[in-house]
Amino acid sequence: MTTEKSLVTEAENSQHQQKEEGEEAINSGQQEPQQEESCQTAAEGDNWCEQKLKASNGDTPTHEDLTKNKERTSESRGLSRLFSSFLKRPKSQVSEEEGKEVESDKEKGEGGQKEIEFGTSLDEEIILKAPIAAPEPELKTDPSLDLHSLSSAETQPAQEELREDPDFEIKEGEGLEECSKIEVKEESPQSKAETELKASQKPIRKHRNMHCKVSLLDDTVYECVVEKHAKGQDLLKRVCEHLNLLEEDYFGLAIWDNATSKTWLDSAKEIKKQVRGVPWNFTFNVKFYPPDPAQLTEDITRYYLCLQLRQDIVAGRLPCSFATLALLGSYTIQSELGDYDPELHGVDYVSDFKLAPNQTKELEEKVMELHKSYRSMTPAQADLEFLENAKKLSMYGVDLHKAKDLEGVDIILGVCSSGLLVYKDKLRINRFPWPKVLKISYKRSSFFIKIRPGEQEQYESTIGFKLPSYRAAKKLWKVCVEHHTFFRLTSTDTIPKSKFLALGSKFRYSGRTQAQTRQASALIDRPAPHFERTASKRASRSLDGAAAVDSADRSPRPTSAPAITQGQVAEGGVLDASAKKTVVPKAQKETVKAEVKKEDEPPEQAEPEPTEAWKVEKTHIEVTVPTSNGDQTQKLAEKTEDLIRMRKKKRERLDGENIYIRHSNLMLEDLDKSQEEIKKHHASISELKKNFMESVPEPRPSEWDKRLSTHSPFRTLNINGQIPTGEGPPLVKTQTVTISDNANAVKSEIPTKDVPIVHTETKTITYEAAQTDDNSGDLDPGVLLTAQTITSETPSSTTTTQITKTVKGGISETRIEKRIVITGDADIDHDQVLVQAIKEAKEQHPDMSVTKVVVHQETEIADE
C-alpha cells in the first residue's frame, strides 16, 4: 500500500463519502456497544448481520451475497493483521480508529453494490484515514437512513440474545481462536518485518549481575557473580557447594557492621534488600553451634566448626584459661601437622600458628610438650578431641549483644542453644532457658522477655532490656527466634498469611531445624570428602564420614608422659590452670582433686602417680535430685547406713563406665622445680582462687567443713554454689570446689604415729567434665529444712554422709554428700577407688544424679 494509491482512492470516493457522513453521525449512538468488539470480528459480524436482516425479511442469501462474504472475510483477515499494530497505540488514538472502522462497516451493510465497486479501495481508505480526525458532518434526512437505523436497531436484541446464550459464546469464541491461529500462520513477510522492527526498538531489560566476595573460615576469599535479585539462600548454597559441605544448616553468611557486631543474612529475602551499598562482602561463619559436635555426620563439617572456634578464641569471643589454650592448641597442631617429627619440625614450629589472643612463649612450650606426646592421632580424631573440650566452655556458641538493664547498667545479652544469658562484668548473672520463656518481643529499642510463672506464682513476669537502637532490638529478637526454632522445634512454622493492617513482624526462621538437619544428615551416602588442611595443606586421613573416636579404648598419649599439671576452669568446665604447686620445707604432700560431672558423654578420670607412704584419699560425691512438688522429699536418711554396707556387693556396669581421664587430657609436672617457678605456681593458685570467688558466691560453711577443719592437718576453703539446670523441670545442682593452701601447715599438727614428717609437697590438679550451659550461679541458697550427718568407720576407711534438704522456689532438693577417707601404708589403685565410689553412689541412688566427684589425695613421705 502506498500513499499515491490512497490519494486516488480519496478522489474517487469524495462524493460518496459526503452522502455517508450523515448516516454515520446518526448511527454512531446506536453502534457504541458494537465498538467494544475486537477488530478481528468486525467484518464477520457485519456479514452475519446482513444475513440475519435478509432472513427476517423473508429473503434468502444469493450466490452473489456468498461471494461478497468470501471477499469480506479475506479483506477482514488483511485488516486484522494491520489493526494489531494500531492496538499498541495510545488509547485516544485507538478509540478514533475504532470509530472510523465501525462507520465504514456500516457503509458496507447499506449497499452491496458500493462494496463490490470500491471494496479494496475502501479498505485502504479506512486504514489510511483512521488516524485523521474527520470534520463534523451535517445532519441530513433521508428515508434510507431511517431504514438502516431500524435494521441496525433490530440487530441489537439479537446481540443481547447472543450474550445470554453461553453455548453460542463459546462456539463463537472457538471460531475466533481458530481464525486467529490461521492468521498467525498466514502472516506476510512485510508484517513480520514490521514486528521485528518494533521489537528491536523496545528497550531490552537485562538482569544486572552482582559481584560477591565471601571470606571463608580458612582465610581464603570466594568470589562469584550472582543475579541482582538473588536471595540469601542462593549465595549460601553456592558457597557450601564450593566447600563441599552437605550439613549446611549450621552455617550462615554474615554482614559485619563493625569489629564486634554482625547481622546475619536472611536466606528468604533478596540480598539487595539487606545490603547497604554496592560492594557485596560477606563472611562465612557458623551460625548455630551444635551442642554435641560428635553427632555431626561428616568430618569436613567438624573441621570447619574447629576453624570457627579457633577464630573465636583468637578474637577473644571465647575466653579460655591457660591450660585450656595449651590443650586446644596441641590438638590444633596435631590436626594440622600430624605426629611430631624432629626432622620435619623445627624448634619454634608452634609459633607459626595463632593459637591465642596473647600468645606467649610459655604457652608455645606447653603446646609443643603436649603435641610431642600424641601418637598416631588422625586429623579427624584431633578435631573431635578439640571440639569435645571446646564445647565445655561457658561462652561456647553464645551470640553476644550489648544492652542495658532498666537501671541503665551495662550488660551483655547472649543467645545460645539452651536459652538467653545475661552477663555483667564478664560474669553470668542470670539465665532464661527456652522452656521458661513464654514470649519474646521488642518495641522501639526495648527488648522484652515474658517468663513462665513458677509453681507458687500466679502471673507471668516480664523482664525488659534497653538496646542501643531499634535496629539492634530487632536484630536480637530475630536471633532469638532463629535459635529457639532451630534447637527447640522439630519443624519450622509456616509464615502466617498477611492480614489487613496486621501488627508485628512476620519474620520466621525459614531453614531446617536441628532435628530435620540430623534426619537429612543420616541419609548422606557418600565417601568421606578429601579436603586440605588450612596451614599445612594436609589431606584428611579420615576414611569414613563420621569417625567417632572411642575415648574408652584409645589413649593417644603414653603413660610415661612428661609431668605437667593441668586443671579445669570452673567457669567454663574445661581444663584450667597449668600447674599448681606449693612446697613447704621438711614435709611432702600430694593433693589430687578430680571433679567429674555426670554427662551423656563419657567423662574422664585422673591417673595420679603412685605414692610411697601414708595416703589419705577422700571422695566427695554429691547427689542431687529434684522433686516437682514442694512438699515431696526423698526419704533416704534411714536407708543410708544399709546402702553403705551393701555397696561392695553390687557390680553392675554403668553407662558412664569410662570415667577415666585419658592421658591426652593430663598435664603432669616434674617435682623438682626452682624457687622462681614455685612462686609462679603460688600466683597461679591465687589466680585460681580469684576466678572461683568471682564465679561462685560464697555461702556459710557447712557442718562438714567445720568438722573437717578440726581434724584435717591443713586448712581447706570450700566454696559452694547452687546451679539450676535449664532443660525440663527445674533441677538444682551443687558445685563444690576445694582449694588447698598448705603454706601455714605445721609439722606437729599432722596426726600420724608410724611415719615422721620431713617435708611436704602438694600438687593440686583439678578436673571438671562437661559443664553444660544449663548451669549458672544463683545467689538464693534456699531454705534449709533438715541437715543430718551419719558416720561409719572400718579399719581402713571412714565414711561420712551428710544429708541436707532445702526448699527453693517451691522445689525440694535433697543433697547427699559422702566423704570417704581411706588410710593405709600400701599403694592404692586410686583409679579403681574412684570408679568404685561413683558406681556405688549410682547404684544406691538410681533416682538421683551424681553432680560432683572430688578426689583429694594426701601423701606424706618420711626422711630416710
Swiss-Prot record:
Q: Where found, per UniProt? A: Cytoplasm, Cytoskeleton; Cytoplasm, Cell cortex; Nucleus
Where does it primarily localize? Answer: cytoplasm
Name the residue ranges with Low complexity bias. Answer: 76-87
Sites where Phosphothreonine occurs are at 60, 378, 736, 859
Highest taxon above the source species = Eukaryota
User: Where does the record place the modification Phosphoserine?
Assistant: 14, 84-85, 95, 104, 121, 149, 151-152, 188, 191, 521, 540, 542, 555, 664, 674, 684, 709, 712
Q: Which residues form the FERM domain?
A: 210-491
Single GO molecular function: structural constituent of cytoskeleton
Gene Ontology biological process terms, A to Z:
actin cytoskeleton organization; actomyosin structure organization; cell division; cortical actin cytoskeleton organization; positive regulation of protein binding; positive regulation of protein localization to cell cortex; regulation of calcium ion transport; regulation of intestinal absorption
The name on file for this protein is Protein 4.1
What's the source species for this entry? Homo sapiens
What gene is it encoded by? EPB41
